């Protein structure tokens, strides 16, 4: 167990000490006695804004936030310490919403017979872009815009021109400086709660040792690749929060030794969350669900999450489900990260996609139903687990069941920067251990090696013939080892595929053929695992299951499915 966990434990224990470590401030935007004067923040005269409390709170102080919808951007620049963190928490049982949207009233009926309403609109996001979009390309001409409109907390669909409008749409017309809205039920907007997103960030924590707990964040007008919540300080904690319905990413983590615990990242336009340089991130007991609702390009950045240049990040005991893209995506120079005891289900592309990164450990997860989208160019990238030019990985004791493909190796000529340097280095799959997994009932293949390289490295040296080129790799040199896995394919399902479909490619219907020719499997068996009822996600083993299957079962607690040991 890493030493920094003890610091997080101490941080959690501090919460039991009440206000003994510092002052307690109250925020209540609904109170008629609330004020943002310096002498506020008391029970009798609470502060009206969270921002005022964030400005005043110092190490050891506790900010209690009462019920309300807070329309502001909160920036925390002060720092606490390990012994005296700054704490911003919702009051017990309170529903605290921090929103990027403002309410708009005084709607006027627009020209024409349809129930379209208009209001002056002078806000322009991404003014540096010729089309107010990021990325500024034809694919993202609509997707990459930042505007959002909600009626009674339900988002409408955006169109680019007023003549494209229909029920349930809106148009932010920059040239006329008007916002047009058509309710999905043709109602009078002056009788409804109509909100439009005006703020691109909701919370930015620049200080260290800051704990934020129990808040709901929504409706930010954030641009692609930028989180509505930004944790940039060391040892910051986000706990029991929800980030939902952002235009882009729910949150971005960029500080070291941060903790994200029991949070929900759901229905965001591009990503649940992103992380860059978030070394020693602990992401635990969270839900990441149904992100990329706007349809950003999945080959660029979209889906459940994306981690870049992170070292020793841990994703554990969390659910990554129904994301429109990859469930978990490591991309560019990550080192020694861990995914363990997670439930990764129904993501439209890969469950876990590890791309040009080093030393990933994937252990004790349940990975089901991933990869069934028709994403263009996603060859070798729609499996339960994909190692894409990512060496020194260990994949152990996972249930990889019912995906498009089970376990994939994906290879091209790739480079990546390393942490702390911009210099690019070559990177490829080698020294991989895939051991004690149950890989079964995947549709197209249980194992597929997608090697799009010209040197034939995916084949044994003996099958390639003699080569005088010392830089030519062979399968033996890659040191890819499958140890003691359990495989099984049902009727009509593939077993073992090797090579890309547009080049030299071989199918191995049996484990014996796969093992005999490639010589990379040791101790594997091809048997029905004997699940009680996979259709209801009951992955307990029936009485006929053999010992080889039981040895490969995930260790510890995995959320959601029914597993051995009482899950």
Question: What does each of the following model-derived ranges do?
Answer:
Residues 55-58, 243, 320:
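Residue-level signal for alpha-helix termini/capping positions
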Residues 24-233, 428, 482, 493-494, ...:
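Extracellular polysaccharide-degrading/modifying enzymes targeting complex plant/algal/animal polysaccharides
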Residues 230, 237-247:
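Surface-exposed extracellular loop regions of Gram-negative outer-membrane beta-barrel proteins
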Residues 18-22:
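Sec/Tat signal peptide C-region and signal peptidase I cleavage site
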Residues 24, 60-62, 67, 73, ...:
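Detector for repetitive beta-architecture
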Residues 7-16:
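Bacterial N-terminal signal peptides
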Residues 1-4:
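Positively charged n-region of N-terminal signal peptides that target proteins for export
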Residues 201-203, 218-231, 248-255, 266-524, ...:
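Glycine- and acidic/polar-rich repeat regions and solenoidal domains
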């Amino acid at each position: 167990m890493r030493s920094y966990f003890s610091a997080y434990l101490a941080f959690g224990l501090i919460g039991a000490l009440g206000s003994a470590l510092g002052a307690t401030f109250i925020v209540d935007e609904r109170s008629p006695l609330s004020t943002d004067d310096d002498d506020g923040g008391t029970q009798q005269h609470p502060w009206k804004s969270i921002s005022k409390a964030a400005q005043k709170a110092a190490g050891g102080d506790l900010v209690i936030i009462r019920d309300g919808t807070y329309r502001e951007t909160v920036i925390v620049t002060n720092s606490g310490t390990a012994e005296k963190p700054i704490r911003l928490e919702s009051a017990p049982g309170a529903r605290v919403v921090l929103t990027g949207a403002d309410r708009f009233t005084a709607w006027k009926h627009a020209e024409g017979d349809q129930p379209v309403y208009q209001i002056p609109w002078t806000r322009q996001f991404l003014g540096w872009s010729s089309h107010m979009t990021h990325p500024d390309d034809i694919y993202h001409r609509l997707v990459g815009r930042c505007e959002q409109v909600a009626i009674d907390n339900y988002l409408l669909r955006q169109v680019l021109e007023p003549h494209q409008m229909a029920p349930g749409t809106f148009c932010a017309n920059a040239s006329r400086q008007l916002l047009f809205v058509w309710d999905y039920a043709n109602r009078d907007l002056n009788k409804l709660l109509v909100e439009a997103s005006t703020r691109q960030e909701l919370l930015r924590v620049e200080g260290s040792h800051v704990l934020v707990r129990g808040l709901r964040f929504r409706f930010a007008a954030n641009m692609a690749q930028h989180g509505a919540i930004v944790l940039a300080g060391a040892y910051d904690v986000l706990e029991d929060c929800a980030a939902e319905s952002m235009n882009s990413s729910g949150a971005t983590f960029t500080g070291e030794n941060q903790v994200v615990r029991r949070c929900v990242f759901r229905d965001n336009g591009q990503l649940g969350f992103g992380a860059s340089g978030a070394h020693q991130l602990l992401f635990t007991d969270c839900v990441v669900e149904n992100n990329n609702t706007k349809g950003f390009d999945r080959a660029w950045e979209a889906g459940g999450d994306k981690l870049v240049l992170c070292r020793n990040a841990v994703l554990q005991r969390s659910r990554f489900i129904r994301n429109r893209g990859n469930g978990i995506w490591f991309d560019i120079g990550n080192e020694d990260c861990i995914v363990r005891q997670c439930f990764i289900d129904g993501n439209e592309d890969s469950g876990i996609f590890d791309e040009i990164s080093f030393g990933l450990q994937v252990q004790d997860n349940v990975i089901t139903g991933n990869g069934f989208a028709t994403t263009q160019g996603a060859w070798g990238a729609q499996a339960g687990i994909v190692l894409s030019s990512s060496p020194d990985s260990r994949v152990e004791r996972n249930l990889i069941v019912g995906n498009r493909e089970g376990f994939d190796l994906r290879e091209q000529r790739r480079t990546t920067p390393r942490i702390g340097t911009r210099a690019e280095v070559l990177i490829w799959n080698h020294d991989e251990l895939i051991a004690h997994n149950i890989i079964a009932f995947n549709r197209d293949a249980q194992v597929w090696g997608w090697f799009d390289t010209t040197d034939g490295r995916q084949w044994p040296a003996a099958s390639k013939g003699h080569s005088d080129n010392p830089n030519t790799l062979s399968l033996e040199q890659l040191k890819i080892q499958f140890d003691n896995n359990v495989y099984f394919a049902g009727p009509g399902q593939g077993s073992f595929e090797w090579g890309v479909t547009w080049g030299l490619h071989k199918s191995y219907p049996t484990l014996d053929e796969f093992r005999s020719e490639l010589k990379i499997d040791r101790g594997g068996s091809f048997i029905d695992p004997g699940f009680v009822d996979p259709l209801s996600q009951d992955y307990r083993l029936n009485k006929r299951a053999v010992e080889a299957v039981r040895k490969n079962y995930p260790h510890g607690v995995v959320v959601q499915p029914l597993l051995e040991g009482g899950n």
